[in-house]
């Protein structure tokens, strides 16, 4: 194989350049995330049944949908939530490896079968089916600090003007509104209803009859009478808009000619569709929020950038006083983490180059293994793209680890060629041919042995297997590419770059005269270390039992400390944000929940001024469910550069918050 490419060096370069181009293209296409997608793909179904209790929603909506979803191909399990605000949510989890698009289509087909069995109100409002990750990528908040807009204004604007735009952003899987649109609220007076002998259904029927969209047709439309001189579309007042118009809706005509109207038995006012949420930003300013879920397999960084670009464009048309904020954003940590790993990768390449130059003492010989590094790394990115993986912490860490391994094959080729040139006096091309005949089998064997160490990780089960499968495949693919480059490109480089040694080997060690003395000193030092090591090994061989006992002791201590080390699924890291989950006793009101959230907010904004940048409180929902007794506080911390000392890290902030929050009575508070 090596002889084939030695006779066709241009072909070898074409292959190497092709591998690099494939890698460059793959880098621009690969999604970027902190970790591989651990959770299996899931499809969420959401619906609203306004006015219904949690039990009613469970019986009339959730159970009907669940019964129709049984038998879905590759579905593992279902989970559902319903609350007293009339919200139903069903999560369908599929087996790992399932195509989310196919799963979404199957769920849609099954849902159509369930629709006729659902309450009419639920059918009219519709059900949303989304394929997205479970965790929020970021939260977009609209706030007003000058008091010109209240929470109802912000919520209506968020849903009517912003939500649809963000849902169309590439990479966004779902936009969950922590808000409600404007709606006409009809407050019934039960005493007046009794006096008039009416029921709430009479009010509903009257509103449906008079608040309708009417198409009035055209004036002078075809076929027209002879001599028609005008054609125009007739416009009439359709949907009612003001409380006065709703109040004037007739409900019943009495025998005496009088009319009972809505205003006679109820009060109409403009409000929000539902009052489940109560949001405040920083020092109690009203807010509305949109939670962004990333589409499965999308690039997290690009998605966040696209969302912010869309908000920047929309902000040009904001009402006076409205501002946008991002109280929760996971992408800065991903960006910093990947940047740190890339920095480590570059440092590792530089260190490998310096170490090779230190030991080889020849810039030409050092360049050859160095050229192999970008070819193999970029080729590995292409392999990741083929497998459908992402650029994440584990794949990048695997590349950092692989750098020290992938240059070994090229170094073996270079050193053997130099040895043959020195001992047998052959020219570079002939020496390379003879060298490759000698070591081709060894190179393949080395690659297989090292790859075999990581093969078992590919077969780990569960979430651990999902995480470390990408790690192992990254290293294995880089090792295989390293062997291929050592057989294809490295011999061509040796034949063209290496030169026979000069008669004065000492003088030919380096072309840089100032470094000659350094390399002479280093070689002498290295030879002394080598001789000392040989003497130590000879001494150890004379006293086998004591050293075997020392070895056994080291192994025992290693096992002892390994068993005492704390374990964890993934390392705890300062991600630049905190989340506090609040749960009050069942039956608690929204007002009580807001009081607790205000105490939490005041602690972080007043006692943690050095670390906290902004804060968003949300009453009415949490990760545990929805309801007046639920709440959350999103805390965004300042940049890591401003929090260098240990007491300013996220773990220390949580440690200080726990005793303070534990003193708040009648609430369970979990800062994470």
Model-identified regions with their sequence ranges:
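Membrane-helix entry/capping segments
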Residues: 294-298, 304-351, 383, 391, ...
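Transmembrane alpha-helices and their membrane-interface boundaries in multi-pass membrane transporters
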Residues: 403-417, 440-459, 467-519, 633
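Helix-loop junctions and hydrophobic alpha-helical segments within the transmembrane domains
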Residues: 327, 334, 338, 342, ...
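Signature of alpha-helical transmembrane segments and their immediate interfacial
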Residues: 1-30, 439, 510-570, 597, ...
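Membrane-proximal juxtamembrane linkers immediately C-terminal to transmembrane helices
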Residues: 31-47, 82, 130-137, 501, ...
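Hydrophobic transmembrane alpha-helices and their membrane-interface caps
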Residues: 23-29, 34, 350-419, 459, ...
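Hydrophobic alpha-helical transmembrane segments in multi-pass membrane proteins
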Residues: 12, 16, 213, 343-352, ...
């Amino acid at each position: 194989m090596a002889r084939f490419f030695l006779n066709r060096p241009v072909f070898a370069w074409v292959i190497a350049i092709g591998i690099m181009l494939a890698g460059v293209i793959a880098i621009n296409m690969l999604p970027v995330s902190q970790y591989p997608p651990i959770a299996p793909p899931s499809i969420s179904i959401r619906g609203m049944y306004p006015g219904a209790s949690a039990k009613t929603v469970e019986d009339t909506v959730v159970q009907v949908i669940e019964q129709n979803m049984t038998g879905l191909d590759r579905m593992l399990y279902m989970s559902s939530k319903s609350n007293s605000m009339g919200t139903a949510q069903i999560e369908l989890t599929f087996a790992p490896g399932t195509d989310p698009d196919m799963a979404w289509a199957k769920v849609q087909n099954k849902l159509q079968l369930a629709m006729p069995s659902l309450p009419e109100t639920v059918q009219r409002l519709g059900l949303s089916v989304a394929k997205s990750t479970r965790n929020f990528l970021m939260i977009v908040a609209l706030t007003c600090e000058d008091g010109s807009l209240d929470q109802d204004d912000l919520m209506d604007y968020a849903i009517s003007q912003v939500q649809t735009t963000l849902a169309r952003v590439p990479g966004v899987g779902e936009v969950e509104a922590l808000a409600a649109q404007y709606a006409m609220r009809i407050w019934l007076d039960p005493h007046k209803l009794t006096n008039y002998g009416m029921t709430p259904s009479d009010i509903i029927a009257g509103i449906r009859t008079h608040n309708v969209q009417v198409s009035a047709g055209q004036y002078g439309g075809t076929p027209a009478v002879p001599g028609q001189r005008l054609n125009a579309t007739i416009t009439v007042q359709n949907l009612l808009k003001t409380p006065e118009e709703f109040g004037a809706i007739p409900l019943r005509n009495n025998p005496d000619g009088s009319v009972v109207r809505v205003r006679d038995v109820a009060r109409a006012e403009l409000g929000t569709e539902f009052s489940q949420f109560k949001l405040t930003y920083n020092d109690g300013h009203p807010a509305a929020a949109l939670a962004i879920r990333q589409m499965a397999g999308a690039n997290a960084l690009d998605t966040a950038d696209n969302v912010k670009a869309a908000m920047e464009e929309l902000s040009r048309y904001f009402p006076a006083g409205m501002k946008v904020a991002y109280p929760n954003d996971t992408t800065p940590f991903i960006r910093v983490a990947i940047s740190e790993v890339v920095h480590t990768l570059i440092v590792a390449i530089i260190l490998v180059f310096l170490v090779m130059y230190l030991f080889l003492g020849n810039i030409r010989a050092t360049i050859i293994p160095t050229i192999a590094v970008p070819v193999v790394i970029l080729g590995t990115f292409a392999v990741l793209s083929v497998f459908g993986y992402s650029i994440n912490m584990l794949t990048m860490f695997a590349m950092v680890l692989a750098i020290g391994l992938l240059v070994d094959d090229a170094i073996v080729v270079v050193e053997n060629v130099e040895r043959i040139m020195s001992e047998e006096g052959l020219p570079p091309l002939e020496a390379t041919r003879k060298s490759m005949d000698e070591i081709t089998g060894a190179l393949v064997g080395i690659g297989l042995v090292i790859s075999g160490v990581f093969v078992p990780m590919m077969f780990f089960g569960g979430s651990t297997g999902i995480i470390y499968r990408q790690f192992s495949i990254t290293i294995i693919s880089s090792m295989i590419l390293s062997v291929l480059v050592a057989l294809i490109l490295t011999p061509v480089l040796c034949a063209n770059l290496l030169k026979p040694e000069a008669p004065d080997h000492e003088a030919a060690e380096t072309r840089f005269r100032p470094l000659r003395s350094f390399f002479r000193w280093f070689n002498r030092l290295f030879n002394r270390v080598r001789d000392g090591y040989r003497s130590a090994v000879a001494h150890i061989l004379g006293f086998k039992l004591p050293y075997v006992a020392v070895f056994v002791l080291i192994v025992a201590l290693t096992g002892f400390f390994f068993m005492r080390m704390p374990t964890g699924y993934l390392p705890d890291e300062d991600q630049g944000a905190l989340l506090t989950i609040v749960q009050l006793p069942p039956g608690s009101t929204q007002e009580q929940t807001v009081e607790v959230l205000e105490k939490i907010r005041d602690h972080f904004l007043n006692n943690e001024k050095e670390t906290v940048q902004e804060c968003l409180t949300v009453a009415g929902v949490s990760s545990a469910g929805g309801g007046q007794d639920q709440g959350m506080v999103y805390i965004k911390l300042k940049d890591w550069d401003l929090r260098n000392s240990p007491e300013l890290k996220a773990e220390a902030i949580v440690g200080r918050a726990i005793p303070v929050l534990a003193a708040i009575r009648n609430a369970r508070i979990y800062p994470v």
